[in-house]
Amino acid sequence: MDYSYLNSYDSCVAAMEASAYGDFGACSQPGGFQYSPLRPAFPAAGPPCPALGSSNCALGALRDHQPAPYSAVPYKFFPEPSGLHEKRKQRRIRTTFTSAQLKELERVFAETHYPDIYTREELALKIDLTEARVQVWFQNRRAKFRKQERAASAKGAAGATGAKKGEARCSSEDDDSKESTCSPTPDSTASLPPPPAPSLASPRLSPSPLPAALGSGPGPQPLKGALWAGVAGGGGGGPGTGAAELLKAWQPAEPGPGPFSGVLSSFHRKPGPALKTNLF
């Protein structure tokens, strides 16, 4: 086998030591150097490797080679979201109104709820505010006014409903009391005494309807005679005995079917004395 290429490598190293790394101008060509991970295999047989000189020294090129610096990577890979930044910029500071400004604003609001642009500009100059601030204040004030109106109307409706319910309750209680006083309840009807039934003995004590009921005829004459006979017969004993005899004459000895049965029975029992003692 031919090992002549080993001798050429030794001669190349000797030449490098002789030059003492003095001149790398011819060998330093970093632009033309390219690294390839796939190294070709050594040929089994081929022409001998030429002698390495200062012009084509690969080792000097490796020593002198410096990798190109990496391009500067930006610190922020993604741009900052502009929406959040703009929102922070658009956020306004709350305006604090003084008492004098509020007084002037309320005065204009009492005059009109919707002032025009000229009125707003004049008011803004007067109270040292911007026209936009004045416009926003009027918008908020109108919203507050509408809210107060709705609350007041709801409260009034609730009060009217409560008053109507109270009136209806009072009227129902009055109706109940009237019904309780006018119409008797079953308990009250049970406690009341029953009306007196017409008694059959009442016509016996009243002598006035007897002559009219008996009619014309000889009947009333014996009746009068019997009455006077009873009175005359009891005259000697006193007024009490005469009244007792009179009541006995009126009362029937036996119950009869009619109201005048007692009178008729007494008339039939005492016909003689009645005729004898007739004063008329």
From Swiss-Prot:
Highest taxon in the source lineage: Eukaryota
Statement: the UniProt record of this protein carries the keyword Cytoplasm: no
Protein name from the UniProt record: Paired mesoderm homeobox protein 2A
Pfam families in alphabetical order: Homeodomain
Chain segments carrying region Disordered: 145-244, 260-280
Species whose genome carries this gene: Mus musculus
Function statement: May be involved in regulating the specificity of expression of the catecholamine biosynthetic genes. Acts as a transcription activator/factor. Could maintain the noradrenergic phenotype.
SUPFAM superfamilies xref list: Homeodomain-like (SSF46689)
Main location class: nucleus
Record PANTHER family: HOMEOBOX PROTEIN ARISTALESS, PAIRED MESODERM HOMEOBOX PROTEIN 2A
One GO-annotated biological process of the protein: sympathetic nervous system development
Family per similarity comment: Belongs to the paired homeobox family.
Keywords: Activator, Developmental protein, DNA-binding, Homeobox, Nucleus, Transcription, Transcription regulation
A GO CC term attached to the entry: chromatin
Molecular function per GO: DNA-binding transcription activator activity, RNA polymerase II-specific; RNA polymerase II transcription regulatory region sequence-specific DNA binding; sequence-specific double-stranded DNA binding
Location in the cell: Nucleus
Gly residues bias: start-end ranges: 231-241
UniProt DNA-binding residue ranges: 90-149
InterPro entries: HD (IPR001356), Homeobox_CS (IPR017970), Homeodomain-like_sf (IPR009057), Paired_Homeobox_TFs (IPR050649)
Start-end of Low complexity biased regions: 153-163, 199-215
